[in-house]
Structures are given as structure tokens and as C-alpha cells.
Amino acid sequence: MSRIGRKSIPVPTGVDVTIAGQTVTVKGPKGELSHTIAEPITIDRAEDGQLNVARPNDERKAKELHGLSRTLVANMIVGVTEGYRKSLEIAGTGYRVTAKGKDLEFALGFSHPVTVVAPEGITFSVEKPTLFHVAGINKQLVGEVAANIRKIRPPEPYKGKGVKYQGEVIRRKAGKAGKK
């Protein structure tokens, strides 16, 4: 059995979980998320209020989806209680970010400013001109938006200029050897 899938999911107080067929809806203080569980996997509520994810057999597809389904539901519960946040930093002379309402405007060495529109459920906050945060309740969406922003100007290996995740270590290369 899947070791992750076997674990029961604790449901904290203040979180309402509704199971309707294969659809799981989680409501909490930060919002509401819904997800449809793949077909062979079943989810039910135990007597102690925890959620259990089960699979009918040991087929390869069922094994693959077992741990995944459990983790997705657990991530939804964390999202509606605590939320998710990714921090990104900008390195480079003249590179900066400013908040324009709900959106972000970047100066990243292009001939024009780059504007990133906040999708529904995502909030941006700018701490410094070189440090900003992407936050929301959907872990997948937060990560996707952060990755798309990083993709605008990924860090280059020679000077490290660009947008990177906070704490990310950029593999550096030596420059040209030069003439002697």
C-alpha cells in the first residue's frame, strides 16, 4: 500500500469538508476549494472526524493515484486554514518590482515594463523593490504563478541576474579565461 495514502487526514476545527461522490469540497477561514478525486479512489470520513483515502485494488494506476489523492486533499485543508506563500527576489542593476493595484509591474532590463496580472485567488505583496511574495489558498496555483513570474527573466549563471525564489542557489559559471 501507499505509505502516504494510508495516513488519515486530520481535519482541524473551523474546517468543513463535504464529500459528494468523487468531489471533495473544503471550506475554511481563508476560503473554499473543491477537487474531484480520480475514479478508483474513494474518500470517507472516519468516526473521529478524520478523512481516509482508500483504493479498491493494487493495480498500478490505483497505487499511483492513492498517495496523490490524499496529498491533494491534505493540501486543500492546509490552504484554507493557513494558505500558501512563495517569496521571490530580484537581482540585477535597475531590476525592480512595484505594485500597481492588485498587479505587479517589473523593470527587468527589457525596453518596456512587464505587467503581471493577479489571477483570481492570488494576492501579491511587495516588501522591497527587490523582494515580493505570491500568496493564495491553492498550492498549485501559487506555485504556477511564481514559476511564470520567474520565467520572465530567469537567473543567468554568470552574474546571477534575474528573478529567483528566495533561498534558491544559482549554479554559477566561470567567465571567459581571457588572454595572457
UniProtKB/Swiss-Prot annotation:
Cross-referenced Pfam families: Ribosomal_L6 (PF00347)
PROSITE patterns in the record: RIBOSOMAL_L6_1
Molecular function terms, GO-annotated: rRNA binding; structural constituent of ribosome
GO cellular component, one term: cytosolic large ribosomal subunit
InterPro entries membership: Ribosomal_uL6-like (IPR000702), Ribosomal_uL6-like_a/b-dom_sf (IPR036789), Ribosomal_uL6_a/b-dom (IPR020040), Ribosomal_uL6_bac-type (IPR019906), Ribosomal_uL6_CS (IPR002358)
Domain of life: Bacteria
Keywords of this entry: Ribonucleoprotein, Ribosomal protein, RNA-binding, rRNA-binding
Biological processes per GO annotation: cytoplasmic translation
Function statement: This protein binds to the 23S rRNA, and is important in its secondary structure. It is located near the subunit interface in the base of the L7/L12 stalk, and near the tRNA binding site of the peptidyltransferase center.
Self-association state and partner proteins as the record states: Part of the 50S ribosomal subunit.
Matches recorded under HAMAP family: Ribosomal_uL6_B
Family: Belongs to the universal ribosomal protein uL6 family.
Name of the protein this chain belongs to: Large ribosomal subunit protein uL6
